[in-house]
Amino acid sequence: MDKEIKLVQDWDKTFPKSEKVKHEKVTFKTQYGLTLAADLYIPKNAEGKLPAIAVSGPFGAVKEQCSGLYAQTMAERGFITIAFDPSFTGESSGEPRRTASPDINTEDFLAAVDYLSMRDDVDAGRIAIIGICGWGGIALNAAAQDPRIKATVAITMYDMSRVSGNGYFDADDSEEKR
């Protein structure tokens, strides 16, 4: 059973509040019945339907940090954006806390796209997602599954496939491995 979540209404971010955007707290459900908490950012001068972006990550972080800053900055540039806490994290529901699942986390992005696509002020044909750090891969998973996602940005620090093959700093670059 999904527990009722309580949202902090005061500005609780690690970055200053922009005077160029409106901010509000929203929630939406995933297909797994979990409630995700999100910060919605809308340009103050918004007119008509706007393109939208869902943002999450880095892995283990909450929307009051990096993803919120990205979302607010993109709203200043004319997008409707949401930064959400993944399932089991921050203000979102799910037990046990601080649990990760690629399938559930991919669904988190898809649920964010569902939420955005149903808003009257969003152009549902122009929805993008941004995944930061470990969430870059989750964003790619979501984009591969959902044709409504028209653009995907994966902001990742390094190539984990190279690390898997060669070890950190190519430590396993032995003659036998080659």
PLM region descriptions:
Residues 2-48:
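N-terminal cap/lid segment of alpha/beta-hydrolase-fold proteins
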Residues 48-58:
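Short beta-strand element of the alpha/beta-hydrolase
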